[in-house]
C-alpha cells in the first residue's frame, strides 16, 4: 500500500522560474469524489509524453493513500479526450531536486487555462513530522485548504473564485503581500 505525505504552499515572486524549464502536464479526472479520485495524466513534450493513472484516497491531515501506474501515452490521451471530466487541469511543472535544496524534492506547478495565475509548490515527505528547508520563494501553506487540490480546481477553477479573493492571492504570488 502506498501512502503520500504531501505539503502544499503558494509560491512568491518569480525566482523559481530559473530552477527548471518545466514540462507540460495535462490531467483529467475519471472520478473526483471526496473519498477517492482517479486521475489520468499526460506529461512531457509533444511526441515524448508519458501517461499515468493514479488512484488517491481521502486526505487525512497531509497524507492519503496513492496508487500510481504508468500507462501508454495513447491510452492516457484517449481517456483524457473521451472519459475525463471537464475542464482538464493544465500546468507547467518544474522540479527542484533534493540536491539543490537539502531535504526533499520540490515540485512547482504553474497552472494554465481556467486556473491561470495560480502557482503552488508541493513537497513529498517521508513522514508527517519531517522537517525541510523552506526556500525563499515559498509562500503561505495551503495543505489544509481543499480548494487547492487539483481535483477541486476542476470543479472550482481559480479563475472563477471571487475576484477580491483571487486578486489577494495573486498579490501574494507576485510577492506584494505577506
Regions found by a protein language model. Give the residues of each.
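Phosphate-end processing signature that detects enzymes handling 5′-triphosphorylated RNA
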Residues: 1-178
